[in-house]
Amino acid sequence: EEDIIITTKNGKVRGMNLPVLGGTVTAFLGIPYAQPPLGRLRFKKPQSLTKWSNIWNATKYANSCYQNTDQSFPGFLGSEMWNPNTELSEDCLYLNVWIPAPKPKNATVMIWIYGGGFQTGTSSLPVYDGKFLARVERVIVVSMNYRVGALGFLALSENPEAPGNMGLFDQQLALQWVQKNIAAFGGNPRSVTLFGESAGAASVSLHLLSPRSQPLFTRAILQSGSSNAPWAVTSLYEARNRTLTLAKRMGCSRDNETEMIKCLRDKDPQEILLNEVFVVPYDTLLSVNFGPTVDGDFLTDMPDTLLQLGQFKRTQILVGVNKDEGTAFLVYGAPGFSKDNNSIITRKEFQEGLKIFFPRVSEFGRESILFHYMDWLDDQRAENYREALDDVVGDYNIICPALEFTRKFSELGNDAFFYYFEHRSTKLPWPEWMGVMHGYEIEFVFGLPLERRVNYTRAEEILSRSIMKRWANFAKYGNPNGTQNNSTRWPVFKSTEQKYLTLNTESPKVYTKLRAQQCRFWTLFFPKVLELTGNIDEAEREWKAGFHRWNNYMMDWKNQFNDYTSKKESCSDF
């Protein structure tokens, strides 16, 4: 009983004991870590918490942060499983802690950061339940809610009323909370590993780049996301435009920043949600309407630049991707794609799809993608275009940036480990053609297949146990290979050989240079195409318009000149 009441720096909290796999885990759900960002604190950095006097009941998940929910496939488990399962509120800055029982001494801590494109997400989803990891690996698991969408990332640079990156400062404050308080829970503040998926992994990699976050953790795990991905960070200019667009849509005057923010602060959060989806003129199906920005405070430069300069925390990282990262985005509106059929698309639909995912790229740029991704040996195969678009979207947005991040990191002599996850869960509600989808390694990391009554296979339970073991080993020792030598050794990823490990229900294998050909295209060739043809369409349109103007001038000039010569002739008659 005494283990479930713990004294934190802000006051006492009461948790609860949960039976897990024949043992016990003590869970503390919904501990506040910041002042609720309400009223005049909306859009501001999180403010630290004052003390409370009685015992805080941390026995149920807190509110989820305000967000738009996914209504694309009502009642369908595949999309609904990611929607918030607690009430939406602006009062949402709470965290959860799972500790093995009896209370450990100096246990390693793993802090989970959820994904959701910086627009959605919550720490209370069943698939993020920390109890299995705590029970099986005897680590302490922590997860926090952070603000998303405009409420978390609206940005007017250097204006403390809405500085941008508020959601990342929320995460950072939760990391500080762990530093100050985790010892009371039996955790070791000097052994803290961040792990996250998608936008959560991009967040983790931003903490690696942010000087203020670096002292607050030890190591990092990035699952299917990184800060150098094309969707992860918005330029200041773009972020400012979106803020102004939002203000305009909501009838707030844009003449004076202070007035504008005051006006936005008075709006109903639901109204902000309805309008924030319209701030990007074209929907790429991967739209991050409001996300991280270079604010000069949390983030001092674009991630690419910081990576290039080697300005990141020197430590070990574990990074990886799934086999079919692109499919999850295609069913949300690429032409010819549906979750209810095989999505065999035509060349024309493939080209239309490219337009959706690369709205600002010239026709020539899109042609270069088609050329590179088409299997010309077998261009009559029905699935070709479907698989090609899956690869294009997955490589460009997830796989190649993650590999590039790992490569840059390892060049400076830091140990990096890379995985390629290729097991399709037998419980996956999405259709077969979608393969090993974005987000579907998470249940294996959190040990959901260990619960007997959930109908995973025995092989999946074994896979999940081995992933948990490797993740926890990495968190404890900076190396996923334990002392026991019965499993395949996971070699270090070096920028030269680029070795990686496959994770599936067979035995893991080591390969080198994942998707080397494709990633060369994205990192080296494609930027050149953009530079040269930048927007060839734009240039061409301007040239044509210019030519028409010139043509008209010429006609005009000719008429004027004829007029002049005829007048001159009539004058010379006198």
UniProtKB/Swiss-Prot annotation:
GO terms for molecular function: acetylcholinesterase activity; cholinesterase activity. Substrate binds at residues 116-117. The modification Phosphoserine is found at residue 198. Keywords: Disulfide bond, Glycoprotein, Hydrolase, Phosphoprotein, Secreted, Serine esterase. It catalyses: an acylcholine + H2O = a carboxylate + choline + H(+). Transmembrane segments: none annotated. Detected in blood plasma (at protein level). Present in most cells except erythrocytes. Glycans are attached at residues 57, 106, 241, 256, 341, 455, 481, 486. It holds the Pfam family COesterase. It is found in: Secreted. GO terms for biological process: acetylcholine catabolic process; choline metabolic process. Its EC number is 3.1.1.8. One of its GO terms (cellular component) is plasma membrane. InterPro entries: AB_hydrolase_fold (IPR029058), AChE-related_enzymes (IPR050654), AChE_tetra (IPR014788), CarbesteraseB (IPR002018), Carboxylesterase_B_AS (IPR019826), Carboxylesterase_B_CS (IPR019819), Cholinesterase (IPR000997). The active site is at residues 198, 325, 438. Esterase with broad substrate specificity. Contributes to the inactivation of the neurotransmitter acetylcholine. Can degrade neurotoxic organophosphate esters. Homotetramer; disulfide-linked. Dimer of dimers. PANTHER family: ACETYLCHOLINESTERASE, CHOLINESTERASE. This is Cholinesterase.
